[in-house]
């Protein structure tokens, strides 16, 4: 099974997960410490963003058609689920806070500084966006 999943595209993986039995979805989502309904919407949203990037879609100021289910703690902070930042929140909850993720977040900051005319707010980034992305789990109840 693991070898088969390694061959899937992200879109195929999303569809495969959606068609699994709920108990299997729960077991997989549990390894990421999230609810399976959240996990399912997240991988579908991530696949959608991936497809936008792969097919020359626009992420800047884009309103996403496939939106991830957000934890209340994030929506209470004013983080929407229909912009890029909402999807980045989901990705940050699926990857460990390792060097690659930190490097990616720093790259976003460097790019935003280099192109100061491009406003991160148009993609749903709040003022404290970097702090949140680097430590998303602290916003979730233990």
Feature annotation, model-predicted:
Residues 1-142:
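Long, contiguous internal "core" modules enriched in hydrophobic/ aromatic residues
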């Amino acid at each position: 099974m693991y070898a088969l999943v390694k061959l899937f595209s992200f879109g195929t993986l999303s569809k495969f997960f959606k068609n699994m039995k709920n108990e299997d979805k729960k077991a997989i989502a549990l390894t990421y410490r999230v609810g399976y309904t959240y996990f399912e919407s997240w991988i579908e949203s991530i696949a959608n963003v991936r497809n936008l990037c792969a097919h020359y879609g626009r992420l800047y100021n884009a309103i996403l058609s496939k939106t991830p289910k957000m934890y209340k703690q994030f929506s209470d902070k004013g983080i929407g689920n229909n912009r890029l930042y909402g999807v980045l929140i989901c990705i940050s909850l699926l990857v460990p806070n390792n060097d690659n993720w930190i490097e990616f977040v720093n790259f976003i900051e460097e790019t935003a500084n280099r192109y100061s005319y491009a406003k991160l707010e148009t993609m749903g980034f709040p003022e404290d966006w970097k702090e949140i992305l680097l430590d998303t789990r602290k916003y979730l109840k233990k």
